[in-house]
Amino acid sequence: MTRMKHILPVLAILAALVSCHERPAVLRDTIPYVKQLAVDTTGTFQLVSTYRTTGTKGSIAVIGEPEVAVQLAAVLRQADQVDNIDGLPKPDRLPDFAGESFDILLDEYNAPYLRMAASSPDSLTEVAVRNAVIAVDSVAYSNALDPRSRLAKNRAKVFVLANSLLAEYGQFDIDTLFKMAGREAVILTPVEAMLEEAAKSGYKSVAVWAPAEARSAYENAAKALQPQLDVTVVSTMGNGLLRPAFRDMLRIYRTLKPGSNLDAVLLDSFTANLEELSAEKEHIHRQITEEDMAFDRILMPHFRFIEPNAAMTGALYRLLREKNLFTHDIAYPTVRYYQTEENRDGEYVPVEVSAAYLSAHQKSEPYVPDID
């Protein structure tokens, strides 16, 4: 009987790997942490096993580094781009996510993710899984070191991973863990959201301006989900000014794809200044220099920038409608903020944070996007 208890989780792992049909990328193994959870069917695995995605109750968990997660939360809370009755793209003076509860998990403890992805990708994957697990817990704390400071918390019905690196280092393993427990994890990433936006716009050729560490996330997702798109990932140094950096990106694209045109550039940044980028695009269009003329030939007349705030807002709305997860309550969205911390046992727990903490991580008013 003991031997069977250890064999069954292994079989569950294999079944989960095969059943991840939504992203038919290269079959790969999950990290040791997830396998460990599968063998120990108490505690964390039991928590995941009791998770339910049916019905409309539960929160939308936004998981990521503090500055980005705070900004995305503000964008989602303020969004009014569609008619809540028929879903058509027209404002109706009612928040798109009316009645929804957002739980924002601010992972300052493990930020920046880019450094972790470069030095220890498996560690970043484990971080993503741990954060997903605490998102489905019904308990939070006011003090991570005091187990008596328990607070009630919503269990997540949707996971919004607010970083492209979490799409590469985490999404697969979160999905695998939940499938091993016989559950479905509803996950949204900026990678899939922006590629979906490009595809539904009818675009054929796009560049993704992203760090080298995020390259495989976009390439794998494009092959699996949007194979009709010609996707080229371009990385620049990222230490200079934005407008010259955009020109550097175009120079690299010309080298990688000589003679090709661009329908759009997908921005792997929640905080990029779209006004500056649009101004540089218009400057190029005036064709003052030979390089301007060369760049202008690359950019299609309908060229635009696709950024994750707008793409994820639209994708989240469509996802909730598709899976019938809207609460349908007539009320303003509620937002609660939690910081990821370790307790005395080294476990991740969500700690509710104050408005003072939030203002320290929101450096400017968030850009509120329009959705085509």
State each model region's role.
Residues M4-A12:
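Sec-dependent signal peptide recognition
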Residues L11-L14, A331:
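Generic detection of intrinsically disordered/low-complexity segments and helix-coil linkers/edges
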Residues L17-S19:
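C-terminal motif of bacterial Sec signal peptides marking the signal peptidase cleavage site
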Residues H21-D372:
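Non-catalytic structural scaffold of enzyme domains
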